[in-house]
Amino acid sequence: MRRLLLCALGLLLAAAPRAAAAAETLPPLAATPPAISINSLYNGMDLTVAGKVPAGSQVVVRLAGEPTTFHMKEKGKVFGILWMNREKVSFSDAPKVFLEAASEGVAPETAAKYGVPGLAERIKAETSDPDKAALVAEFLKFQQAEKLYRDSAGQVTLAPEADGQTPFSAVLHVPSRLSPGTYSVEALAIKDGAIVARGQAAINASFVGAPAFLANMAFDHGTLYGILASVIAILGGLIISRIFQGSKSGAH
């Protein structure tokens, strides 16, 4: 019995350094710009992430929005003829935005594991349909088509090793459809397909200028916002009708 206990203790001690290595934290990441301003002219942007990983590592960089629940409707054939919305489907623990970029030495299967395909393990489909995995796969395809989820969303460049570390720089192409909130930027140091170290930073995105004014108006003064929106819509319709009337009279 004593020998068995000693063997078990030896195995635990042998595994301890490996667990410690797996939990290594990278030096602080530097993100440029440190915050994202969504103004009237915002149409997407490039986010640069720089840091250092242990020498001999490859790098995966990810940007993820806050987890949320998406409510959608599943389409199916009715009477075997018409495609219609059949029932509601909710996808929980799904990030609003998810971008991934990997250095050239990362194997495709490893990039997929830590990229969009890997989200299938965390996103849950809430529906009566028994084939939930297929629904999650379709959800991922939809988000990719909307350019909210992307693999190979940029480039990761490794610099020469120095003092046991490899500096890296990543450029992620942030989509134009970005909502205000806090976004997580994460760098993964990869060796032999496994994470040996990781680092994280937070990026805040916020409305500025006219979008901020309209958002505040909508939330804080809903009635006034509704009236102004109606007036603008009516005026826009009148202007367009005048333009068409003028073009018709000019044609005669």
Task: Please name every model-derived segment.
Residues A23-Y42:
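N-terminal edge beta-strand
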Residues T48-P54, V171-H173:
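Short edge beta-strand/loop segments characteristic of extracellular beta-sandwich folds
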Residues T68-F70, P108, I190-V196:
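Short acidic/polar inter-strand loop motif in beta-rich domains
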Residues K77-S179:
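Membrane-proximal low-complexity regions enriched in glycine and acidic/polar residues
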Residues R177-F207:
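Extended, hydrophilic extramembrane loops/domains of integral membrane proteins
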Residues T223, A233-H252:
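Juxtamembrane interface at the cytosolic side of transmembrane helices
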